[in-house]
Amino acid sequence: GFFGTDRLGHLDSARLRETGQNVQVMAVYTPPDRTGDAAYRYAADFVGAYDAVLDSAANRSLDPPWQRILGRADLERACRPGGYGFLLFMEGASPLRGSLGDLDRFFALGVRGLTITHNHDNEAARGCFAEGPDSGLTAFGRELVAALEARGMAIDLAHANGATIRDTLSIARRPLIDSHTGLRAFHRASPPQLRARALGDDEARAIAATGGVVCIDFLPDHLKGPREPGRRVGLDDAVEVIAHAVDVAGVDGVGLGSDW
């Protein structure tokens, strides 16, 4: 578990504190086979699991404990020496069931950011694996972007198709992010889905121009595409992609988005 000492998995409280990391964004991911009410329940249960971690005796015994980040003051407090916080971020709009009322419900539960799609289509937009017409935001998706901005929630374009990215850029009035991505410049020989999952240079540049950030992830296929037998993708490859992103989007427009 999160407070265990077996050091299994990618993340636990002890390792976060050892590295000096104050804030952890916690993804509320919904698989594509969950839609409608099933997607809503799945995401609500996911949020409940994070709440259970924060409310647990193991967390309360820490000095200081992990806290919920619900606004700017919470974030600033968590980023001070000795502060620690969780920020909940929904990955894919399927749990909203096409309803701004559901957005309000998840906002009340502590969700403070939304990745509009996760590869597949939902009520708000088309994902990067979508087939057929190159459409982007739906009518609900456009309402959703405005509603997210009105609530001060982060808008994430990871996993979106090109039309969804263009549509969102055309109406957004606040900074946008891509929380975990590769760059299409390194995928000239990759299969279509991997190319679609990566950002073009123009897209990365446009996201950074909003005052936002493009975060490069560390998945080998996302960095360089399918590997030749026996070839490992390593730190040098990640640095090469990050350096290209900085050339395109500027140093202030690039971050790390491990996707682990």
What label would you give each PLM region?
Residues 133-171, 175-181:
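Loop-centered beta-sheet repeat module
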